[in-house]
Amino acid sequence: MLPEISRSMLKNALVLGLFAIGTVGSVALLQQGTATRIAAAEREAQVRALAEILPAGSYDNHLLDNRIELNAPELGHRSPQSAYLALKGEQPSALILPVTAPDGYSGAIHLLVGIFADGRLAGVRVLGHRETPGLGDKIELAKSDWIRSFEGKSLSDPNEDGWAVKKDRGEFDQFAGATITPRAVVKAVHGALRYFDKHRAQLLGLAEDEQ
């Protein structure tokens, strides 16, 4: 009787063991599949966000595959960040810089700033902020078109004094009841243009005779 019981217990143990292995394997495959889908969704979201900044037809490469690692405190970074180089016919056409405005009303404002190779602004988008709903959040494109007022601007258009909100005798509108937020964004975008102008050849990978 005991040998029969032992064989039965062993058989049950083997069955349970195989079931457990199969279950673990299935869970692992499911987790791997889920992680793959999440990664793909995140990549697609990044592609869409970057594509909003540059006009269609201004580049023909995959932006996420052309990253430039930056260590740039001038752009408000405390750690290395990724910029994205746009190419057209294998020539640099624009660069998207990650920029942080540290002096928003409620904290840091995180931006993406697209700059054409000739130094004109292609576009600016807000990645994240904690500004006051109904006031400072008008920096979001979903809330107003204010962020589009940067498009086509450059270091020389407007001039140095013009890179400020109108309350500070500059060219850019502020919001009713909220001046600090747009002031911080204008300052950060202007800083991004200065950084690009200073490091243009290095950022775009140009030889000296192409500068």
Swiss-Prot record:
Subcellular location(s) of the protein: Cell inner membrane
Pfam family, one: FMN_bind
Residues carrying FMN phosphoryl threonine: T179
Transmembrane segments: 13-33
Cofactor: FMN
Major enzyme class: translocase
Cysteine disulfide links: none
Assigned EC number: 7.-.-.-
Entry's Gene Ontology BP terms: electron transport chain
GO cellular component: plasma membrane
Subunit structure, interactors included: The complex is composed of six subunits: RnfA, RnfB, RnfC, RnfD, RnfE and RnfG.
NCBIfam families according to UniProt: PRK01908.1, rnfG
Protein name, per record: Ion-translocating oxidoreductase complex subunit G
Native source species: Ectopseudomonas mendocina (strain ymp)
